[in-house]
């Protein structure tokens, strides 16, 4: 059996010259202009002259790239959406995708550093014109962490196998937040895939702290990081700029021995606001105990690099019910320990709770990886 009639021809075209598909770009571009982004690019970005004009008009090209990314473009070809319908009547100076691709390919490491300078100054202006970090004059937090972005192809510059055993590039992010604000990315670095997490971390921390200060973080400023960034250079970079630190410690023999000296009566029980999944014990946990003791870190280094501060320990019961026969209990409780090194002036409970909130940077990384920006991270 077959149809006795030809199928009707159906076609769709979305090229109405009066159609504006991305009207929300208008306030975004106006805010960028009010904060001086085009002027900052024109002042700080200098590309070499070429016969094909690749490096000409960097401000117009950068604004086109920013607008395209805000509109959801995840490739160079997608930048053509800025020239769709009536977009050309709403915005002027929009460049073709091929022009933008040639512009980006002309960048060297030095030109990327120029863009970093633009981003720092723009964030300062954005904080001046908007309530970007409310409460920053009282307390603010800088969180740093790195991640691996998978890449494909054998010729990708800088790609390699890092700590995750995945071939890709290593991205380092610095995030600023306050108790009243959402996290804001203040600094970024794109590094070779095999890069150690702590490579160049001290300079990166210093840059992020300076950016946070320029955005109004004039009060208590605490750097939070995981154990990959536990080092004398990172902590001393914080202290040199008047910032506090709260960094997860590696559980080496010295740290374990120090925790063992804590008196049993010094442990204070706490209850987590929400249950947490314990990967090691493969179970949910909802309570723990905390204590603190003074600790001198980096004793193998010169005296001026050694740091004495608070060691905050958290211990969690090992709940291994699956290994205990039915109807029987354990002879005694066993614990897993987690340690943080901090000079925070807050009380023990508050300092420990604030340290756990370092997980906010993990959410920022997840948002970046699961948004349109992930493809730009891979294409960089």
Per-region residue spans from a language model:
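Short, solvent-exposed helix-loop connector elements
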Residues: 46-53, 348-355, 372-380
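Structural preference for beta-strand elements that scaffold enzyme active sites
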Residues: 139-141, 220-222, 244-246
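Dynamic "connector" segments at or just before major functional cores
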Residues: 1-196, 202-215, 241, 263
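Short, surface-exposed basic-aromatic patches at helix termini and helix-loop junctions that form
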Residues: 235-244
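Acidic/histidine-rich, metal-coordinating catalytic segments
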Residues: 145, 219-230
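Beta-rich nucleic-acid/ligand-interaction surfaces
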Residues: 229-233, 255
């Amino acid at each position: 059996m077959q149809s006795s009639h030809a199928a009707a021809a159906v076609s769709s075209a979305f090229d109405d010259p009066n159609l504006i598909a991305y009207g929300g770009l208008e306030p975004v571009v106006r805010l960028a202009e009010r904060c001086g982004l085009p002027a900052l690019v024109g002042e700080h970005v200098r590309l070499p002259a070429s016969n094909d004009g690749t490096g000409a008009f960097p401000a117009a090209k950068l604004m086109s790239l920013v607008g395209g990314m805000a509109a959801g473009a995840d490739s160079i070809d997608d930048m053509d959406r800025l020239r769709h319908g009536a977009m050309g009547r709403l915005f002027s100076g929009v460049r073709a995708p091929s022009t933008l691709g040639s512009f980006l390919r002309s960048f060297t490491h030095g030109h990327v550093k120029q863009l970093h300078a633009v981003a720092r100054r723009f964030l300062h202006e954005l904080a001046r014109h908007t309530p970007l970090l409310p409460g920053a004059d009282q307390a603010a937090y800088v969180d740093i962490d790195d991640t691996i972005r998978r890449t494909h192809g054998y010729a990708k510059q800088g790609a390699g196998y890092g700590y995750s055993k995945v071939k890709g590039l290593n991205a380092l992010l610095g995030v600023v937040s306050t108790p009243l604000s959402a996290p804001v990315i203040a600094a970024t670095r794109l590094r070779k895939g095999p890069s150690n997490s702590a490579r160049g971390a001290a300079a990166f921390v210093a840059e992020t702290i300076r950016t946070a200060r320029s955005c109004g973080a004039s009060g208590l400023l605490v750097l939070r990081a995981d154990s990959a960034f536990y080092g004398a250079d990172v902590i001393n970079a914080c202290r040199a700029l008047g910032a506090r630190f709260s960094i997860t410690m590696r559980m080496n023999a010295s740290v374990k021995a120090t925790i063992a000296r804590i008196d049993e009566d010094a442990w204070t029980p706490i209850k987590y606001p929400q249950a947490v999944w314990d990967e090691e014990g493969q179970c949910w946990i909802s309570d723990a105990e905390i204590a603190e003791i003074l600790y001198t870190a980096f004793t193998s280094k010169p005296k001026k690099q050694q740091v004495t501060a608070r060691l905050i320990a958290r211990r969690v019961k090992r709940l291994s019910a699956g290994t205990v026969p039915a109807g029987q209990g354990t002879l005694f409780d066993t614990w897993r320990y987690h340690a943080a090194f901090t000079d925070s002036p807050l009380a023990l409970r508050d300092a420990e709770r604030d340290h756990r909130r370092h997980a906010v940077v993990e959410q920022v990384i997840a948002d970046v990886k699961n948004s349109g920006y992930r493809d730009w991270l891979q294409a960089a």
